[in-house]
Amino acid sequence: MSTALTISNIDLHYGAAQALKRISITCAPGRITAVLGRNGVGKSSTLRAVTGINHISAGEIAFGSDTLRKAPPYKRARLGIGYVPQGREIFPLLTVKENLETGYAGLSRGDRNVPAYIFELFPVLKSMLNRRGGDLSGGQQQQLAIGRALVTRPKVLVLDEPTEGIQPSIIKDIGRALQFLRDEKGMTILLVEQYLDFCREIADDIYVMDRGEIMHNGPAADLDRADVRQHLMV
């Protein structure tokens, strides 16, 4: 199931402003790769480039043997890129069940079901299946957003700040879920995060960004280095 995701020398502009400068990231198969940095350095723009929401002006993104530069978001999703956006973006008026079923869009009829392991990872989703998404707490909505992405059967799971504004107990649940997906499902995971302890605990590889550029990459243990942390201090 593991598939590599390779970002090679991409540039991205918003009008005349350059947001990303020659960004290169390799997400090795079956590993968790974390991208860190202060607010506004281009982390989320990088993820939106991967998913096709933002269009790059130079470089290439490859997913296994497929090149993605011209592929629209729906095609990337069908190839196996699952996305959990910042802010969760669940549908508040739909039930938990209906929110999960929105992940069916790109699936064949035979695959249109919610894999049992999603409810094992996030039992609250099963117990609140018929409740509206808007009734869930922020942490529960994040679990729902991750569950919805997993319904699409991704080979690579991309998450934008999955711990933002969430209580510590649910952060631990999310961390355990991502480790399960890596260790038991062989999933490749790319996440943007500012919570250093979370990344130190679950990430295999890190990339540190500043002003739209990669300043450092290496193992998660490098987060203890002073020259790395200087790019993360507010």
Residue ranges and their predicted role:
Residues L36-R38:
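The feature captures the beta-strand-to-loop junction immediately N-terminal to the Walker
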Residues K172-G186:
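Helical segment within the ABC ATPase nucleotide-binding domain
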Residues R132-L136, Q140:
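Conserved ABC ATPase signature
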Residues G59-T67, L79, D111-V114, E120:
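Conserved ABC transporter NBD signature motif
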Residues T51:
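Helix-to-loop junction immediately C-terminal to a conserved catalytic motif
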Residues L5-I7, L20:
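Conserved structural motif at the start of ABC-family nucleotide-binding domains
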Residues A149-L150:
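ABC ATPase C-loop
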